[in-house]
Structure formats: C-alpha cells, structure tokens
C-alpha cells in the first residue's frame, strides 16, 4: 500500500481523530453483533500504546442529520471500554465547546468517543465547515473505517484537507489484501459472484473478467444469465433489461479464456417460507409457477471442486436465500468448500457473504473477511475510494 499508516507517524502526545466503523446492529439499546468494534481494536490499542490521545468518531444507522436518541453511541462506548479494559469517555457532541473541553482534559493513552457524526447534516454532504470543526479537535486524522471508505463524507474524507491523514491498521490490511488480490493474484484465481441483482454486480463482473481464471455465478442474479441462455425460469428473479448484458458477459468470458460457471441444477419452491416444500430440478426444467431460490447439489459439487483447485478465491454474494433454512444449503456448501480448501486464500467481500460465514460458524476458517460491503465491492470494481484517496502518500 502506498499510503501512510499510523506506523509511519509520531503519535506520542498527539490528539488523534480516528474515524472508525462502529455502525453495529442494535436491538432495544443492545449491540447484537460487535464484529466491527472488535475489528477496530488493534488500531485503538496501537494508538494507546504509542501515547496518543485517542478521539474516536463513527456513524450509527441513518439519523438523517438530526439527533436520534436510540442512535447515540453511548452503548458502543460502554462496550468498547469493557473490551479495552479501561475507562472510555463519551461526548454528547461530535465537535464544539463540549467536545473541545473533553479533549483538552485528555492524557496520553486516554480514549474519547464522540457522538454519532451523522447527527449533523453536513456529514454526508462532506461540508467543509463541519470537516474544519472535526479537524479543530485534533493534530492527526486516522481513517480506519474501511466500511465507509467509499463515502466522501466530512469525517471520512473532508477532514483530510485540514490535517495530516494516515490509515489505521484495519484499513491498511483491507487495502493490502484486496489490492494484492486484484493486482497480483495467485493463480488459479476464482471469483464467486452471487446476490440478488445483476445491476449491483455489473461493475465487479466487468472488472474481474480481466483478472480471474474462473468466474462462478450464483444467487438471484444467476437466473438472468440462465434466461439469456434461452431457458425458462418460471417465477425466478430476472432483470429482463439485463439479458443482453448477461449474453455479453458470457461472450467476453469466452474471448478472454475465463471459465464461466453457472448453475446446472437449482432448488425451487412455490412459497417463500421456513417450511417451504422444495424440489431440485435441472436448469432447463423450472416449472412456470415455481421459482429458483438456491443452487442445487450437482452445482455445489462443481463449485466446490473449482474452489478446491484455486489458489485465491474472492467471494461476494450468497448462492441463495440463505436466511431461510430450506434455501441455505448452496451458500453453506460454498462456505464449507472454502473452509476445507487448505491451499486456498479466501477473501470474503463483506456484506451478506460475511454474514453467511458468520451464521454458519465458518468465519475463523476464512483467510480474510472484509469489513466493508459497499466499499469492497467498489474497490473490486476498480473504483477509487474517497476515504483512501485523501490519505497522505508514503
């Protein structure tokens, strides 16, 4: 990575405005999944050890520019204190006199959590005045929020106009792993692209067709490709306006010598529920009143075989509606194949794929699970991320 990180700067006694991604799911004021808080710990601990005054900023939910009581970061600050085993202070504002006073009272190694930055309308507009207010609290800006790196907001990008800007350890790791995967991959390199919609994955499929040896397609978006081959797909998800594009992608794969894998059999159902009756049919035999909801057993075997023989696999998007038990087997099988593949470096591209490997208890068997759904997708599309571009070069 050619951007400076916290390892490249002197932090002792410095006030550090560290943008983290503490956007954790909450239920009735309780955190239901603290993965993102834990992911930020190495950076926070490093800052503490180096004698910095650690000022943490994050968003939580979508308060739309106003204070929303249940989206305050108070429970997050409390949990962070428990995880760090030290007193963590919480400010009720993200800038201004109250925050400045609390920062002025900090000693080296102290940790302060600012209020939800999205309580202020200027945050998502990347307002220069708000960015200046944030910058006034600190000497150095650290961006460790890879999950928000694709956003040009005041606390992720704008603030870098007024302070020296470096990456945290999590951001550095994400950029290293994803960057290496795209610029210098070990081969065979396989991408698994799933999820519901072709339109969400157009950019990533197009970009990866130039990089990969194998492209595996699954999830709801597969049926647009199946229809492009001339098969009937019943009531399965289909984007009719993307059928020509699907044909174009299959043709491109052929021209570039990329092995393009699609389902050969699918799990179908007539109702969308936990107790649904399902059948397994070949891809050319979906009845008109049924819909495809998962990849079938033959497809799972083929995909597992490709995975096993790959050196690098990037996975973005589930193979079926994994949230419901009858439609979860395909996604589980892909996860299992990655967990079992000893010589394969597996990169899970955040979002639903990350949720799936967590759900099936396979997370610790994956080489790298990205903390950014949208950010990792845009990175894999070859786009520049505003929260990265703004950091100082080495």
From Swiss-Prot:
GO CC, alphabetical? cytosol
Q: At which positions is ATP bound?
A: 201, 292, 323, 350-353
Its top-level enzyme class, in one word, is transferase
Q: Which reaction does it catalyse?
A: (2R)-3-phosphoglycerate + ATP = (2R)-3-phospho-glyceroyl phosphate + ADP
| One GO-annotated biological process of the protein | gluconeogenesis
Q: Cite a single GO MF annotation.
A: ATP binding
What pathway, per the record? Carbohydrate degradation; glycolysis; pyruvate from D-glyceraldehyde 3-phosphate: step 2/5
Compartments (UniProt record): Cytoplasm
Going by the UniProt record, its keywords in alphabetical order are: ATP-binding, Cytoplasm, Glycolysis, Kinase, Nucleotide-binding, Phosphoprotein, Transferase
Which positions carry Phosphoserine?
A: 183
TM ranges? none
Task: Return the Pfam families for the record.
Answer: PGK
Per the UniProt entry, the Enzyme Commission number(s) are 2.7.2.3
Q: Which residues carry this modification: Phosphothreonine?
A: 299
Write out the similarity annotation.
Belongs to the phosphoglycerate kinase family.
Q: Which PANTHER family match?
A: PHOSPHOGLYCERATE KINASE, PHOSPHOGLYCERATE KINASE 1, CHLOROPLASTIC-RELATED
Q: How does it assemble?
A: Monomer.
The molecule here is called Phosphoglycerate kinase
Species, as recorded: Bacillus mycoides (strain KBAB4)
């Amino acid at each position: 990575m050619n951007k400076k990180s916290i390892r490249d700067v002197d932090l002792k006694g410095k006030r550090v405005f560290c943008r983290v991604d503490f956007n954790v799911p909450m239920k009735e004021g309780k955190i239901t999944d603290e993965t993102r808080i834990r992911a930020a710990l190495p950076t926070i601990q490093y800052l503490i050890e180096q004698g910095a005054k650690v000022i943490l900023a994050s968003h939580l939910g979508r308060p739309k520019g106003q204070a929303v009581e249940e989206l305050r970061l108070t429970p997050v600050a409390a949990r962070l204190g428990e995880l760090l085993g030290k007193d963590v202070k919480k400010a009720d504002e993200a800038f201004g006199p109250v925050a400045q006073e609390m920062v002025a009272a900090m000693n080296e190694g102290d940790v302060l959590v600012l209020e939800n930055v999205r309580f202020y309308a200027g945050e998502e507009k990347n307002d220069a005045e708000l960015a200046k207010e944030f910058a006034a609290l600190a000497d150095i800006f650290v961006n460790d929020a890879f999950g928000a790196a694709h956003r040009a907001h005041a606390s992720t990008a704008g603030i870098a106009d007024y302070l020296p800007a470096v990456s945290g350890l999590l951001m550095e790791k994400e950029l290293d792993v994803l960057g290496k995967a795209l610029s210098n991959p070990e081969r065979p390199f396989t991408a698994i692209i799933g999820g519901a919609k072709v339109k969400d994955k157009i950019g990533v499929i197009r970009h990866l067709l130039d990089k990969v040896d194998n492209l595996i397609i699954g999830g709801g978006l597969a049926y647009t490709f199946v229809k492009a081959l001339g098969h009937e797909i019943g009531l399965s998800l289909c984007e009719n306006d993307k059928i020509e594009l699907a044909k174009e992608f299959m043709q491109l794969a052929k021209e570039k010598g990329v092995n393009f894998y699609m389902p050969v059999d699918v799990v179908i159902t007539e109702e969308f529920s936990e107790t649904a009756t399902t059948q397994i049919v070949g891809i050319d035999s979906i009845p008109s009143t049924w819909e495809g909801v998962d990849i079938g057993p033959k497809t799972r075997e083929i995909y597992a075989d490709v995975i096993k023989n790959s050196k690098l696999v990037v996975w973005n998007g589930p193979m079926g509606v994994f949230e419901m038990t009858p439609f979860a087997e395909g996604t589980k099988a892909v996860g299992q194949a990655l967990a079992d593949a000893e010589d394969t470096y597996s990169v899970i591209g955040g979002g639903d794929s990350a949720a799936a490997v967590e759900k099936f208890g396979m997370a610790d068997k994956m080489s790298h699970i990205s903390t950014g759904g949208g950010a990792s997708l845009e990175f894999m599309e070859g786009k520049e991320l505003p929260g990265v571009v703004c950091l100082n070069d080495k």
